[in-house]
UniProtKB/Swiss-Prot annotation:
Residues of the signal peptide: 1-18
Cofactor(s) it depends on: heme
Function: Cytochrome P450 monooxygenase; part of the gene cluster that mediates the biosynthesis of the secondary metabolite ustiloxin B, an antimitotic tetrapeptide. First, ustA is processed by the subtilisin-like endoprotease Kex2 that is outside the ustiloxin B gene cluster, at the C-terminal side of Arg-Lys, after transfer to Golgi apparatus through the endoplasmic reticulum (ER). Cleavage by KEX2 generates 16 peptides YAIG-I to YAIG-XVI.
Lineage: Eukaryota, Fungi, Dikarya, Ascomycota, Pezizomycotina
Protein name (database record): Cytochrome P450 monooxygenase ustC
EC identifiers of the protein: 1.-.-.-
Glycosylated residues in this chain: N52, N92
Designated gene of the protein: ustC
MF (Gene Ontology): heme binding; iron ion binding; monooxygenase activity; oxidoreductase activity, acting on paired donors, with incorporation or reduction of molecular oxygen
Alphabetized Pfam families for the sequence: p450
InterPro entries found in the cross-reference section: Cyt_P450 (IPR001128), Cyt_P450_CS (IPR017972), Cyt_P450_sf (IPR036396), Cytochrome_P450_monoxygenase (IPR050121)
Pathway it works in: Mycotoxin biosynthesis
Residues binding heme: C318
Gene inactivation effect: Impairs the production of ustiloxin B but accumulates intermediates such as ustiloxin F and C.
Superkingdom of the source species: Eukaryota
Length: 403
């Protein structure tokens, strides 16, 4: 046998043994899942950047059950009751949260002890009490100044600066993305939009809110039950986060459905999957129906709030979630005071941008490499605009899902 043939045969034999071990003799072999996902991480990587990831995850749970082996060392879960188990206070984040800059921030710190210390340092600035002091000053001006002064490609940023920039990014990108979803689902349902507008007019007439031409406060917006129901339903039905993985704790591991998960296993679930769980929200969980929040009993509402997942879960829940809610309530109330006409246009090829951060370990040093690209997939373009025939003056034109 020639050396080349021997080398090729040996390579294939090693690969075959590795595949057999991962598929049938791995500690996670007892959990069902797709074959490719159990033998290679490329399966998970591919679906992370695919625009239909959430639909694919839903199909996996339909086929394999509430716990699916998604990668050689990873599980995805569709069971709200397991959220407190997965996101316990000792759970460390995985390498999924690779730092965007070459240093860690409060958000990207993997070790829960380091996160607690970092969280305490900024809690006074973005916590619940700070929210009331800063309602009228929160905006994008600071973010614009920071990026003009420090280019991430030319200037090294120190840790406090990284923390500040990532905090601004969280408030200036994730929340508007959620706001777009709120307005989209309200505007595409005429009955919901009409009911919300009637609530705004009634609240204006009885003095609960100022005239619709004035600026509404967060406190006043929270007095509107149907507006609150629309926002909570949009957060359930169309969240912005894809998944939030955690490692099974060192030393103890986890127990999921009476099955042991060894330490170091990546366990994740998705706000989109939990929000569509029929055991939690009923058989119409796949429908956008804000009325469910008004019809729910106090026990049901408490249960839904307990498993609310759009700002994260557990000890690492977003510290500034009050700021995000403030933006959602205030802007949604202002925009929906002007009836919106929704135009949904089909595009043969819709471009979706993706951004992947790769964490590479070379010669003992960690390097962060970002990869950007575009996927061309069939899709729809949404343009929402104010009804020009409405009695209020002004014009609103929003491309909510820009390619």
């Amino acid at each position: 046998m020639s050396p080349f043939i021997f080398a090729v045969t040996l390579t294939f034999a090693i690969l075959a043994l590795g595949i057999l071990r991962r598929r049938y003799f791995h500690p996670l072999s007892r959990f069902p899942g797709p074959f490719l996902g159990s033998v290679t991480s490329l399966y998970q990587t591919y679906w992370h950047v695919h625009p239909n990831k959430t639909l694919h995850d839903t199909e996996l749970h339909r086929k394999y059950g509430p716990i699916v082996r998604y990668s050689p060392n990873g599980l995805i879960v569709n069971d709200p009751a397991l959220l407190p188990v997965i996101y316990n206070r000792r759970a460390n984040k995985t390498d999924f949260y690779a730092p965007v800059f070459d240093t860690h921030s409060t958000f990207t710190r993997k070790d829960y002890r380091e996160h607690v210390a970092s969280r305490k340092a900024i809690s006074h600035a973005v916590g619940f009490l700070a929210f009331f002091r800063t309602e009228y000053s929160y905006g994008l001006v600071l973010l614009m100044i920071i990026f003009k002064q420090y280019s991430v490609t030319n200037t090294r940023l120190f840790e406090p600066q990284v923390d500040g920039i990532l905090s601004e990014l969280a408030g200036s990108s994730v929340t508007p993305s959620q706001l777009a979803r709120v307005i989209f689902h309200i505007s595409r349902n005429f009955k919901v939009q009409e009911k919300l507008y009637e609530e705004l007019v009634a609240a204006e007439q009885d003095g609960r809110i100022p005239p619709l031409s004035a600026i509404i406060s967060d406190e006043q917006a929270h007095r509107l039950p149907f507006l609150s129901a629309c926002i909570r339903e949009a957060q359930r039905y169309a969240p912005t986060m894809s998944q939030l993985p955690r490692y099974a704790p060192e030393g103890t591991g986890l127990e999921l459905h009476e099955q042991y998960v060894p330490p170091g296993t990546s366990v994740s679930t998705s706000p989109w999957i939990i929000g569509r769980n029929k055991d939690l929200y009923g058989e119409d969980a796949n429908s956008f129906r804000p009325e469910r929040w008004l019809e729910a009993s106090p026990e049901e509402e408490r249960r839904w709030d307990h498993f609310s997942f759009h700002f994260g879960y557990g000890a690492r829940k977003c510290l500034a979630n009050n700021f995000g809610l403030m933006q959602l309530y205030k802007v949604a109330a202002e925009v929906c005071a002007y009836p919106i006409r929704c135009l949904l246009r089909y595009r043969a090829h819709h471009e979706c941008r993706y951004f992947v951060v790769l964490k590479l370990k070379l010669k003992g040093r960690t390097r962060i490499q970002s990869v950007e690209g575009r996927l061309r997939v069939p899709g729809f373009a949404l343009i929402a605009e104010q009804d020009p025939g409405h009695k209020h003056n002004g014009y609103i034109n929003m491309d909510l899902f820009r390619a």
